[in-house]
């Protein structure tokens, strides 16, 4: 049963999509999902922001960065702790994205946060960091994040248990999500349930063909922001008592992005 008052964050940053997003990092399988349209991407971004506002979340919108085609995926730039007043500043594993993080430094500094930058040879992107409300943070090792980067995360947030596992996708959050109340979601057979069970987490498994739906955003109080078009996942979550809000983000999924990628939360628990 889903509880109340379990929201992980009350405020997020978002960044408007640049026209250069047509040159985003992707692969043919994802690129085929949608022909790029700046107008359509902008409209989908606007609806996404409206969904967050409707859930009572404060959204601070930042302007587009034309020099960085993937910059709309602002989640990757940092991991921000609202309780500790600490932020880990990313060092991108994707060389073409290095420099994006510099555009959030002044914002983090203006908030009075203690900034822990990931230093070479470390790499860490926010999409590999799954924060939960149970004092456990799952950090994914991927082509974008390495062990040195995760060590920076552990040092910055000693108040939580940072557990490392191999990401089964571009990022850990590509196919693994958090649903509140010690519950995770992923595609069937993708992760060994025992990895999470030993930390007290249940795992809801969705059909393999809808694995991208696991990149969802838990809004608290049983509400889930889900990418549109994943009907089996929506029905399954509703059976578990969740209230589903959908957002069409096909333009961003064509760039291998998802619901979590489009916002940078200030986590209450960190």
Curated annotation (Swiss-Prot):
Classification via Pfam families: DDAH_eukar
TM segment ranges: none
SUPFAM superfamilies in UniProt: Pentein
Keyword Metal-binding tagged: no
UniProt keyword terms in alphabetical order: Hydrolase
Enzyme class: hydrolase
EC assignment: 3.5.3.-
InterPro entries attached to this UniProt entry: DDAH-like (IPR033199)
GO BP field: arginine metabolic process; citrulline metabolic process; positive regulation of nitric oxide biosynthetic process
Record: active site: 171 (proton donor), 261 (nucleophile)
Similarity-based family: Belongs to the DDAH family.
Cited PANTHER family: DIMETHYLARGININASE, DIMETHYLARGININE DIMETHYLAMINOHYDROLASE
Protein's recorded name: Uncharacterized protein APE_2601.1
Organism: Aeropyrum pernix (strain ATCC 700893 / DSM 11879 / JCM 9820 / NBRC 100138 / K1)
């Amino acid at each position: 049963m889903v509880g109340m008052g379990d929201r992980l964050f009350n405020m997020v940053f978002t960044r408007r999509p640049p026209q250069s997003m047509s040159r985003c990092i992707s692969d043919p399988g994802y690129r085929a999902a949608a022909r790029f349209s700046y107008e359509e991407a902008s409209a989908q971004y606007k609806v996404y922001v409206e969904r967050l506002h409707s859930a009572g979340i404060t959204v601070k919108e930042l302007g587009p960065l034309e020099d960085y085609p993937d910059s709309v995926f602002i989640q990757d730039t940092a991991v921000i702790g609202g309780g500790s007043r600490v932020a880990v500043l990313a060092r991108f594993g994707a060389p073409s994205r290095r420099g994006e993080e510099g555009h959030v430094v002044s914002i983090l500094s203006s908030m009075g946060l203690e900034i822990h930058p990931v230093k070479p040879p470390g790499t860490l992107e926010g999409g590999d960091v799954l924060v939960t409300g149970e004092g456990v943070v799952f950090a994914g090792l991927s082509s974008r994040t390495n062990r040195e980067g995760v060590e920076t995360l552990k040092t910055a947030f000693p108040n939580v248990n940072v557990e490392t596992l191999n990401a089964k996708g571009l990022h850990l959050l590509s196919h693994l999500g958090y649903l509140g109340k010690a519950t995770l979601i992923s595609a069937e057979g993708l992760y060994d349930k025992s990895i999470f069970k030993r930390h007290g987490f249940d795992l809801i498994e969705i059909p393999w063909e809808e694995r991208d739906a696991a990149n969802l955003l838990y809004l608290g109080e049983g509400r889930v922001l889900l990418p549109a078009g994943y009907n089996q996942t929506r029905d399954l979550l509703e059976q578990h008592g969740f209230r589903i809000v959908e957002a069409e983000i096909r333009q961003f999924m064509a760039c291998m992005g998802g619901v979590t990628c489009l916002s940078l939360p200030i986590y209450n628990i960190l």
